[in-house]
Amino acid sequence: SLGLDPKVHIVDGNKNDNFWMMGDTGPCGPCSEIHVDLTPEGDTRGTLVNKGSAECIEIWNLVFIQFNANPDGTFSALPAKHVDTGMGFERVTSIIQGTKNFTRFAEATISNYETDIFRPIFDEIEILSGKKYGGTLPASSELAMLDAQQATDVAFRVIADHIRTLSFAIADGI
């Protein structure tokens, strides 16, 4: 049957998976994450959640800020509690565009950068650099392990991220 079965699709977690802290001290609390299973079958029953798989992507999280983590490792209740929620706009866009509006999962290439958000930036970088963006996604983050195209693609993504960051900063008057 189609749809959400809470017994199957809601995955229990522990403090490592379901408790958010910004650092050793400060506001914190339990959290929930919403993931999308991008496997061809479309349902791995939560086995890929928080395993670093490109086929199971977190698109949304909710943090129920209700504690303060103290330097001695204890937690104090906060006088005011709130929910901090965040959705990955680029992640949602990449899933929608990469799966042809959730219709084709088998041949999907899901990357925040394989969207119409980044293509105009990559086009301009190609013109200015004389290099082509290949869309490779290296298995390793070790720069020494990358081939020439992977290194070029990483550089394109870094430049594009910096351009977007600067655009937002300029728009905010910074």
State where each predicted segment sits.
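Structured aminoacyl-transfer and RNA-binding surfaces used for tRNA recognition/handling
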Residues: 1-174
